[in-house]
């Protein structure tokens, strides 16, 4: 279920996905909600483009640390490529 950040208290949330398009974000929200995950989604900026880099806005999806592995597995099974930190 989509939550506000304060629902998670002082937990350091884990970024699991960056949706670049609204349709993609809405689909992912449905997948996470249907599976019963609590998550936060917030707009933020990322760099995109191959030849011409530009700053874009996407939907950043976060989950609690205890849900990270299960959420990543769910995303992969649903055809999404989870965000991997560098």
Predicted regions and their residues:
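Acidic/polar low-complexity segments and flexible, solvent-exposed patches
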Residues: 1-86
